[in-house]
A protein has these predicted regions:
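Short, charged alpha-helical interaction segments and adjacent helix-coil junctions
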Residues: 2-8, 12, 76-81, 167, ...
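Conserved single-residue anchors adjacent to enzymatic active/cofactor-binding motifs
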Residues: 1-208, 294
């Protein structure tokens, strides 16, 4: 199970704290989005202050809190990713996570009776404390393009930006560089990061935020316990099934040995024990017995 961070120890690199800071200070949020997009944003409006796909964290661990729009109606979702989550199958989940976010936000934008041409431009921003593609870039920007001609863009107005806090190169502004350094070190280095740090402490002194975090952690623990117990039950069931199968196989081998000693024909042993010819021949060889064909 995941270790729990105390509320007073939360840093900006924690997703809960990051979202609380972005939601509670419009000016900081606007400046950060503008620095990532490398454009001046005059104003932002919070579309949903708590767009939770299922109460708190579901099995995917997804909680969409910071959804906003600028003066041009472009929508943004801000997310802090402190872990590169890998599935049991060994697949990194971040790319599929972006697809899931897009589908949920798009469905939310499409009101009943409206056409799909009402979809506003969407930018999904993931600030990561790890370099997902290991190329050292500050920002990886993705749009849909034609593989046969990369100059052709599928103009679906969806952009995904993976912002790498460990980045070393790329054309980004100083404000973003300093913010990413602050994310990794927790040490403010300019006026902007000092303002962010002050807002972090303001959140820590907010009783409501503390209560929300405690409820969130309780929900996460509950989910982990249920998942653990389900895994235990599945393990017991699997072990029981394997044990029964092994018992039946052992009984078949013992029966085959007795029949081999009585020089019963191979076809009869095969039919009686459901063992293959290869298994019976190998068993006979292991026990120094003769196989009677027929």
């Amino acid at each position: 199970m995941m270790s729990e961070t105390k509320f007073e120890d939360l840093k900006i690199s924690n997703d809960f704290m990051f979202k609380e800071v972005m939601k509670s200070n419009k000016g900081l949020c606007k400046r950060l989005v503008g620095s990532i997009m490398q454009q001046d944003i005059e104003d932002i409006v919070y579309i949903e202050t708590e767009k939770t796909l299922q109460p708190y964290y579901d099995s995917r661990g997804i909680r969409l809190d910071v959804i906003l729009a600028d003066e041009n109606h472009t929508r943004y979702n801000l997310e802090m990713q402190a872990r590169n989550v890998i599935s049991k199958a060994g697949v990194a989940l971040l790319p599929k996570r972006t697809r899931y976010y897009q589908s949920v936000i798009d469905m939310d934008m499409l009101k009943q009776g409206e056409n799909f041409d009402q979809l506003n431009p969407l930018v999904l921003i993931f600030i990561c404390t790890f370099d997902f593609y290991k190329e050292g870039r500050y920002v990886y920007t993705f749009k849909s393009r034609c593989l046969e001609n990369l100059e052709l863009e599928l103009a679906n107005d969806v952009t995904v930006k993976l912002v790498n806090a460990k980045g070393k190169h790329g054309q980004v502004n100083t404000l973003l560089k300093n913010f990413l350094r602050y994310v990794m070190t927790n040490e403010p280095v300019d006026d902007f990061t000092e303002d962010v740090e002050r807002q972090v402490w303001a959140v820590k002194n907010d009783k409501k935020a503390r209560e929300e975090y405690m409820v969130l952690q309780a929900k996460i623990r509950e989910h982990e316990i249920v998942a653990y117990e389900a895994g235990e039950a599945q393990g017991h069931a699997t072990g029981l099934a394997e044990g029964l199968a092994e018992g039946e196989a052992k009984k078949s081998r013992e029966t085959a040995i007795k029949m081999l000693k009585k020089q019963k024909p191979l076809s009869e042993i095969k039919e009686f024990t459901d063992m293959s010819e290869e298994e019976i021949v190998r068993l006979a060889k292991e026990n120094g017995l003769e196989v009677i064909n027929g």
